[in-house]
């Protein structure tokens, strides 16, 4: 299972700095789950710890109960997450995470794992399932490196030259991994993780030669800023479908190039474009035969229906399933509806997308206290649903709105 002989630095999938960013991102994700359950405090979050105590070196950060609020059982859960992401069991190194308690020691251990595994390394990402639950998806280092080369080709085919990466998305998501970890590692570029900063804070970091990695939701957060990017900045958006508002907000910032990437956790990147009205072009590393796409011989099953044009470009027609994307997360309207129907005073409910958030229409008995029911529903949603899956707007009616044909109508 391991590579033959030591690897040269240029043959490794990730550099040490990228491994560190991934570890921080995985720890933060584990803590976010615990924070929602009230088991850790905001002051114990790894992001806060790295910004306090005189700005200690990240390598010296202790991964323990006193520092990050992780007791022995919570440590087991974290170790399982980190070991599973990097597939440390392939090199029999996963148990060392339990005895090494500094962030730098974890990074060194994972770096050693990659030295042993080489191109046989594997990574497991989780889909952004907000309601149905995340699903693990494993990708080989070879496939990820192939896509990384495709990204580099797209970015270097014309100016400006990218000299640094600013990422506004979590590093352990496949989009963040490819663009803010693998790509800069392979090109020898500096990368900064800014996912926890405000929109204005992100913009203050930008300088000429940067690649800014965001989602449509993030780019639209810049709309209210009276700000223009420095010259020669490239923007990229993915994680959810871009809209006219996404492109308007991004264009107002004045990037030299703006890339829209289509793909998923299951497939990796599939297509890209630089203008909203253009069709997507397939990434350079993909093979297409009879409208079937593959990467390194592995067929890629798309979650959307697409239409091909005569020049080999494609347009996305819509999802094959009933999943919506909200702020970069997959949301099942049916699952949200089931949560709302737990209230005994709700006779029926319907949920759909309303701009960037969800809206719900609630059927209640005539004369029911709608304000009181809305308070109850918002409390239920807060307890049982992550933020992207919580309806932002409620409308009440005695019957759900329907068309003359009996189909559910918009409201």
Curated annotation (Swiss-Prot):
Task: State which Enzyme Commission number(s) the record gives.
Answer: 6.2.1.12
Would the keyword Ligase be found if you checked this record's keyword annotation? yes
User: Which positions make up the signal peptide?
Assistant: none
Q: Which UniProt keywords apply?
A: ATP-binding, Ligase, Nucleotide-binding, Phenylpropanoid metabolism
Q: Which reaction does it catalyse?
A: (E)-4-coumarate + ATP + CoA = (E)-4-coumaroyl-CoA + AMP + diphosphate
A matching Pfam family: AMP-binding_C
What are the recorded GO MF terms, alphabetically?
4-coumarate-CoA ligase activity; ATP binding
One GO biological-process annotation of the entry reads: phenylpropanoid metabolic process
Cysteine pairs forming cystine bridges in this chain are none
Functional summary from the UniProt entry: Converts p-coumaric acid into p-coumaryl CoA. This is necessary for the activation of the photoactive yellow protein (PYP) chromophore.
Q: Which family does it belong to?
A: Belongs to the ATP-dependent AMP-binding enzyme family.
User: What is the name attached to this protein's record?
Assistant: 4-coumarate--CoA ligase
Naturally occurring in which organism (per UniProt):
Cereibacter sphaeroides (strain ATCC 17023 / DSM 158 / JCM 6121 / CCUG 31486 / LMG 2827 / NBRC 12203 / NCIMB 8253 / ATH 2.4.1.)
What high-level taxonomic lineage is stated for the organism? Bacteria, Pseudomonadati, Pseudomonadota, Alphaproteobacteria, Rhodobacterales
**Originating gene:** pcl
């Amino acid at each position: 299972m391991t590579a033959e002989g030591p690897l040269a630095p240029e043959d490794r999938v990730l550099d040490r700095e990228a491994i560190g960013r991934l570890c921080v991102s995985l720890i933060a994700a584990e803590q976010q789950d615990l924070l929602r359950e009230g088991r850790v405090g905001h002051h114990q979050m790894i992001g806060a710890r790295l910004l306090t105590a005189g700005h200690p070196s990240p390598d010296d950060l202790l991964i323990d109960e006193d520092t990050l609020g992780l007791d022995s059982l919570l440590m087991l859960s974290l170790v399982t997450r980190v070991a599973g992401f990097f597939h440390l069991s392939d090199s029999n190194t996963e148990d060392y995470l339990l005895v090494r308690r500094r962030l730098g020691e974890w990074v060194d251990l994972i770096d050693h794992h990659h030295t042993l595994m080489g191109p046989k390394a594997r990574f497991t990402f989780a889909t952004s399932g907000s309601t149905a639950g995340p699903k693990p998806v494993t990708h080989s280092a070879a496939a990820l490196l192939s896509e990384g080369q495709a990204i580099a080709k797209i970015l270097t085919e014309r100016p400006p030259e990218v000299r640094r990466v600013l990422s506004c998305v979590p590093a352990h998501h496949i989009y963040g991994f490819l663009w803010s970890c693998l790509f800069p590692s392979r090109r020898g570029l500096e990368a900064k993780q800014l996912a926890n900063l405000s929109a204005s804070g992100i913009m203050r970091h930008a300088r000429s030669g940067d690649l800014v990695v965001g989602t449509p939701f993030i780019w639209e957060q810049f709309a209210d800023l009276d700000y223009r990017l420095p010259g020669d900045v490239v923007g990229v958006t993915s994680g959810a479908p871009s809209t006219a508002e996404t492109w308007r907000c991004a264009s107002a910032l004045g990037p030299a190039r703006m890339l829209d990437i289509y793909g998923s956790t299951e497939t990796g990147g599939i297509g890209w474009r630089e203008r909203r009205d253009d069709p997507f072009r397939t990434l350079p590393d993909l093979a297409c035969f009879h409208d079937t796409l593959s990467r390194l011989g592995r067929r890629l099953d798309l979650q959307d229906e697409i239409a091909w044009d005569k020049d080999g470009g494609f347009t996305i027609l819509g999802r094959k399933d009933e999943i919506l994307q909200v702020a970069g997360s997959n949301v099942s309207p049916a699952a949200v509806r089931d949560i709302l129907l737990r209230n005994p005073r709700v006779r029926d409910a319907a949920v759909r997308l309303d701009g960037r958030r969800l809206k719900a229409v609630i059927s209640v008995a005539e004369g029911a206290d709608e304000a009181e029911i809305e308070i109850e529903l918002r409390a239920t949603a807060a307890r049982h649903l992550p933020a992207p899956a919580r309806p932002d707007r409620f409308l009440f009616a005695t019957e759900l709105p329907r068309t003359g044909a009996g189909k559910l109508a918009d409201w």
